[in-house]
Regions:
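Short loop/edge segments at beta-strand edges and connector loops
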Residues: 5
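Acidic, low-complexity, intrinsically disordered interaction modules
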Residues: 15-73
């Protein structure tokens, strides 16, 4: 499965009313550039996960990426 843009993920989320947004993993990855730096990268294929997208967050250590998923579970 590949990381897609947030817009594409929200489109999938709206198409499946039973889906919800959930963190894909608990890791934090240092922010590099923009979301396009992460779009297209391969991630583990997990049953029930419809899409994965990158989201920018910030804490006291600086900006980081959090991978979010659209899931049916």
């Amino acid at each position: 499965m590949k990381i897609i843009t947030r817009g594409e993920a929200m489109r999938i989320h709206r198409q499946h009313p039973a889906s919800r947004l959930f963190p894909f993993c608990t890791g934090k990855y240092r922010w590099h550039g923009g979301t396009e730096a992460y779009t297209g990268r391969e991630v583990q294929d997990i049953p029930g996960v419809l899409a994965v997208f990158a989201e920018r967050h910030k804490d006291s250590f600086g900006p980081y990426v959090r991978l979010m998923s659209v899931t049916l579970n």
